[in-house]
Amino acid sequence: MKKILKEFLYRKGYKINKINKNNLLNDNPFLAIQSRLGSNPIVFDIGANLGQTILKVKKIFPNSYLHSFEPSKVCFKRITQDYGNVENVFLNNKAVGHEKGSLEFNEYSWSALNSFFKRAYTKSEIIDTYFVDIISVDDYCNENDIPYINLLKTDTEGFELNVLKGANKMMNQNKVQFVFVEIFFHENYIGQSSFSDIFNYLSQNGFNMIRFYDFEYTDEGFASRTDALFINEKFIK
């Protein structure tokens, strides 16, 4: 009977599949990991921009401890106004990299493109350039007595590999559970991190990729960018 019904609906243009109870397959990355993080996870939002991730995380994890990093003077002023008084949101007007220091930062006319790198093609112009302070994830955790990171999100417009290298100690000690990282396939920035570099680095540090989210394509139809979710293999059940 089930087979007959399935074939009938298929001829009508409908396809029936079993409900997949694996939360990791949820189209929303934050809902995908919700059941594995508990009610008050520690989240690192690296490359906060205008606070988009703060809003998403606090909606799903209202009791989370969220450490947000944004080097842009303009963007940081905005997120301070919007989220400066939100409980357990810690705002840092710094960039994150593989070690402490400072580096020249490019502010674009569209803030989502702000980066240490110059664009490979011009759809937005640089309106300001200045040096910003950089801290590593490992140093920040050490200085602020942060025992672990449930979710490390990095969206830094090509600087992702540098961010991840700065979390090497935390990763090696299995103190990072999930990594949510922006990936470029097409050259968007000169000198950007490649997909293979990021994938290989995380694999070498014991992370398995779960899936991609929000694929974008070039005008020619080639893969341009996406976001990828990785899980530390020590947390796979």
Regions found by a protein language model. Name each.
Residues 1-237:
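Phosphate/nucleotide-binding beta-alpha loop and adjacent structural elements of enzyme active sites
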